[in-house]
Design a protein with these regions (language model features):
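N-terminal mitochondrial targeting presequence
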Residues: 1-54
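A charged, amphipathic interaction segment
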Residues: 161-247
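Generic detector of well-ordered secondary structure
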Residues: 1, 11, 18-21, 80, ...
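C-terminal structured interaction module
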Residues: 2, 247-249
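Intrinsic-disorder-associated interaction segments
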Residues: 20, 42-46, 64-67, 169, ...
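N-terminal non-cleavable signal-anchor helices
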Residues: 11, 28, 36, 107, ...
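Conserved, aromatic- and glycine-enriched, well-ordered alpha/beta core segments
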Residues: 57-73, 77-103, 110-174
Length: 249
């Protein structure tokens, strides 16, 4: 009786002493189909995956960082290079912050038009279509730099009140969006463009000289022509913008 018990215990231990490793493929007789052992990791971490992850979280994306710097550089070339005094004097504009913003706004729009054109694709079988790309990204960076500069300048205005300053920025933002739409509509026709200039620069005043509006329209056409001549590669990494003088139009 004791021998039988000892024998049964030995057999029981031998049958269950081998533990099953559930992390490995099944090799027992219970597996009816063959199992192919994967030689690769469950999640393949390659350069493409890492790059996508970095883009998602906004880390270490060198190309986007360079493009953002391009956008900020492009904006800075407006207030640093445009001769505002010539615009004030030649076009009989008041030397005020509002006039400064209107002139800056126009030059920023010219940059936006050029960079948005970089995202327009066309082929022999398809019509032109717009696809958001680097041009759209740089455009947003230019606008971002504009508002950062505006907010900073308003703080230094004499007697500036923070609450009033925020309200002014909001109003300027609304005017900016309306101006962009109006200028865009005038791209293909001088009459519409002249109306947009008259409204934005002179508030539709009947006392304005027609030659002033015509001069601004001519400047816009000439400047767009010059911007269109800049190659795409230079536009991305080493943009050199030469702003034309309003006095030569």
């Amino acid at each position: 009786m004791n021998r039988a018990r000892i024998l049964s215990r030995v057999l029981w231990r031998q049958g269950f002493s081998k533990k099953i490793d559930y992390a490995r493929p099944c090799v027992t007789s219970l597996c009816t189909n063959s199992v192919n052992i994967r030689r690769q990791a469950t999640v393949a971490v390659n350069d493409g995956y890492v790059k996508k992850f970095m883009k998602a979280v906004g880390w270490m994306d060198q190309e986007r960082t360079r493009l953002k710097l391009t956008g900020y550089f492009l904006y800075e070339c407006v207030p640093d290079s445009v001769s505002y005094d010539e615009w004030f004097e030649d076009l009989e504009l008041p030397d005020t912050f509002a006039s400064w913003f209107t002139i800056t706004e126009l030059h920023v729009w010219l940059l936006l038009v050029r960079y948005m054109a970089e995202d327009v694709t066309s082929s022999a079988s398809e019509k032109k279509k717009y696809v958001k790309g680097d041009g759209h990204f740089v455009r947003n960076c230019i606008v971002e730099a504009l508002w950062a500069d505006v907010a900073n300048r308003i703080k230094f205005l004499e007697g500036a009140n923070p609450a009033i300053a925020r309200k002014q920025v909001t109003e300027l933002s609304e005017q900016f969006q309306a101006a962009l739409v109006a200028y865009d509509e005038g791209l293909n026709e001088d009459k519409i463009l002249a109306a947009a200039v008259w409204r934005r620069f002179y508030s539709l005043s009947e006392d304005v000289k027609a030659e002033h509006v015509a001069k601004i329209v001519h400047f816009i056409r000439h400047q767009l022509f010059m911007l269109d001549k800049i190659p795409s590669e230079k536009l991305r990494w080493k943009p050199e913008i030469n702003w034309l003088s309003i006095l030569k139009h």
